[in-house]
Every structure is written in structure tokens, then in C-alpha cells.
């Protein structure tokens, strides 16, 4: 938000209420210049009212159920949030009558795991063995179908792209089952770190690297029509 403010933007954010206890928004909200709207992305009428009223020039869609373990407990809610939420936002944005750039953040987990040593390419097959990964793959398919059906050569106002983000690390992540925050919490209490998948190797990027990439993608999408409807990896995986 601060980055966008420094660039001269008026910012509106739509989100569920923050998690109880420590959370990034609670700590920073006094210093944020933002119109704060509370609601569920699954509620298309709520989305439509706030977006139509605000008339955004640029939209970054980061709302998601983003925890793999939670997706096993609540698969229906995970799909509703990640897939239906994407469809709802696309539907609302397609009704705008002014130019709008929209970046949909999905995940590099959207690819079918084919156990290769190279990094995945945007043209690789989508898939997912767990509910979180498959919901993100499904969101990509919904995005692609909506673009082909209702935006490409049909909507002169809306340009869209997806950003497939990899693992990020940075301040303010209090979600459960986060490797780096869990290490910091355990070490601060002189406790042993519990690793859920000790045989896995995970690449990381700082959260500001990913965010700067999203800003750059929005800028390029605004200037280059040929990027409309494309997907881009933001990961070192």
C-alpha cells in the first residue's frame, strides 16, 4: 500500500477481517492511506458495488485461501475462494466502462508435479495433487476461459494477466505452518523446530521482489496489448 501511495495512487483494499492476534494489517494500519473494505470475495454483489463505485484503474487480485493444510480441512471453501472468487472478480471487471489493468496472482503450485530438475515453464501442464494446488490450477483455467470467451477481441477496456508466484519470505506472515516464521518463533523460545517436510527443497524470494514484479507487469500490460491474457512465472522454481 505504501509503495502504491508513493507512486501517487489512491488505494482501496477488499479483504476479510484480519486474523485474531498478531497480524500485519493491525500493526501497520495507522500508517496506511487506504480505503478499507471488509467482505468476502465469494459475494459477487459486494464486489460489484465496491468496485463499480471506486472505478479502479489497476487491480491486484491477491485474495486467496493460501494454506495447503487448510485446504485439506476445508476443500469446498478453498475452491470457492480461489476459483469462484476469481470468476466473480473477472465478471465484475468485465462490466467496467473505462480502461482497467488487472493482475491475478495465482501460484507456481498450479503446475502438474512431474518431478523435473528444471524450473517449470508457463507452457507446462497444469495440475495439482492437493486441494490448494488444484484450486490454483483451476483458477488459471477459469481465467483462460473467461479471457477467451469475454475479453479477447470483445472488451476494449479490460486487460488481464496472471502472475504465478513462488514461495516468498518477509515480515508480517503469522499464518500457521510457515517454515521461516515457524523457525523464528521456535528459536526465539529456544525450542526445536518441527519440519513438516524435511526431505523437500524449497526456493525462496523476498516478498518485495514479487510485489515489484507485479507492479512491473501491470505497467507492461498497460503499454503492450500483446501481453493481454498471458501468464507469467514470478518464481525461481
Predicted regions and their residues:
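The catalytic Tyr-centered alpha-helix of NAD(P)H-dependent dehydrogenases
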Residues: 117, 128-135, 176-180, 203-207
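Glycine-rich Rossmann NAD(P)(H)-binding loop
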Residues: 73, 165-172, 194-205, 223, ...
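A general structural signal marking secondary-structure boundaries and capping sites
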Residues: 70, 93, 97, 150, ...
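C-terminal structured domain segments across diverse proteins
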Residues: 122-124, 135-136, 160, 181, ...
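N-terminal Rossmann-like NAD(P)+-binding domain of SDR-like oxidoreductases, especially those catalyzing
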Residues: 1-165, 169
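Alpha-helical substrate-binding/gating segment
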Residues: 181-193, 204-232
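Conserved strand-to-helix beginnings and helix N-cap segments that scaffold or border functional pockets
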Residues: 48, 72, 173-177, 207-208
Amino acid at each position: 500500500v505504501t509503495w502504491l501511495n508513493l507512486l501517487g495512487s489512491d488505494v482501496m483494499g477488499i479483504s476479510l477481517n484480519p486474523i485474531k492476534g498478531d497480524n500485519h494489517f493491525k500493526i501497520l494500519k495507522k500508517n496506511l492511506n487506504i480505503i478499507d473494505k471488509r467482505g468476502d470475495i465469494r459475494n459477487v454483489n459486494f464486489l460489484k458495488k465496491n468496485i463499480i463505485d471506486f472505478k479502479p484503474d489497476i487491480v491486484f487480485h491477491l485474495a486467496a485461501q493460501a494454506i495447503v493444510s487448510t485446504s485439506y480441512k476445508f476443500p469446498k471453501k478453498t475452491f470457492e475462494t480461489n476459483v469462484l472468487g476469481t470468476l466473480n472478480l473477472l465478471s465484475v471487471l468485465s462490466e467496467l466502462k473505462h480502461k482497467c489493468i488487472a493482475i491475478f496472482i495465482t501460484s507456481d503450485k498450479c503446475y502438474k508435479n512431474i518431478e523435473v530438475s528444471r524450473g517449470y515453464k508457463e507452457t507446462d501442464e497444469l495440475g495439482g495433487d492437493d486441494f490448494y494446488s488444484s484450486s490454483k490450477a483451476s483458477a488459471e483455467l477459469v481465467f483462460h476461459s473467461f479471457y477467451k470467451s469475454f475479453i479477447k477481441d470483445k472488451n476494449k477496456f479490460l486487460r488481464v494477466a496472471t502472475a504465478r508466484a513462488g514461495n516468498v519470505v518477509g515480515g508480517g506472515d503469522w499464518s500457521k505452518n510457515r517454515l521461516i516464521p515457524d523457525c523464528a518463533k521456535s528459536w526465539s523460545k529456544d525450542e526445536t523446530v518441527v519440519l513438516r517436510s524435511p526431505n523437500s527443497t524449497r526456493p525462496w524470494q523476498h516478498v518485495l521482489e514479487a510485489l515489484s514484479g507485479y507492479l512491473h507487469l501491470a505497467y507492461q500490460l498497460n503499454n503492450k496489448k500483446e501481453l493481454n491474457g498471458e501468464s507469467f512465472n514470478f518464481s525461481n522454481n
